[in-house]
């Protein structure tokens, strides 16, 4: 009889260990998913900025996200309106895919020998400065409200 009780105790401890491993695996899987989403979102915005060099030159993408602005570009847009549309779409994606997702973008022309004039920018030259993007999110929002935010920082040239 004692052997059965000891066997049940050993078996239950083993099951608890297996359950703990499954919880850790699920948590790690969720963290990997969120980090993949951050990478995709950052690349998406960088590509939007690359497609709208005039908006980048004018500083229309600089700022903090999520952004509450709304711009409908179904009938055509100026570069500034397209940047506002991109900001709104990306803000929506940040809120949808990342818990407590926020970001900031800052593009500078520091160190450039010459910054183009407005007339030259209208000719759509590629952006010559650097942009920095920082995305923050919470990986453990449901488990621990005081968990530190994760961040992804990227220096790029659109």
Language-model region placement:
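Flexible, low-complexity segments enriched in proline/glycine/serine and punctuated by aromatic residues
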Residues: 27-158
């Amino acid at each position: 009889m004692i052997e059965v009780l000891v066997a049940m105790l050993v078996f239950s401890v083993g099951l608890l260990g297996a359950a703990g491993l499954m919880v850790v695996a699920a948590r790690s899987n969720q963290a990997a998913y969120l980090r993949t989403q951050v990478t995709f979102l950052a690349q998406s915005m960088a590509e939007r900025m690359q497609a709208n060099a005039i908006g980048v030159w004018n500083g229309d993408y600089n700022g903090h996200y999520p952004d509450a602005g709304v711009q409908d570009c179904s009938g055509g847009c100026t570069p500034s309106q397209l940047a506002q549309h991109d900001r709104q779409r990306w803000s929506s994606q940040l809120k949808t895919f990342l818990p407590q997702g926020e970001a900031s973008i800052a593009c500078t022309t520091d160190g450039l020998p010459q910054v183009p004039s407005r007339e030259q920018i209208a000719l759509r030259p590629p952006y010559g400065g650097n942009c920095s993007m920082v995305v923050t999110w919470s990986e453990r929002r449901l488990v621990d409200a005081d968990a530190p935010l994760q961040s992804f920082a990227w220096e790029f040239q659109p």
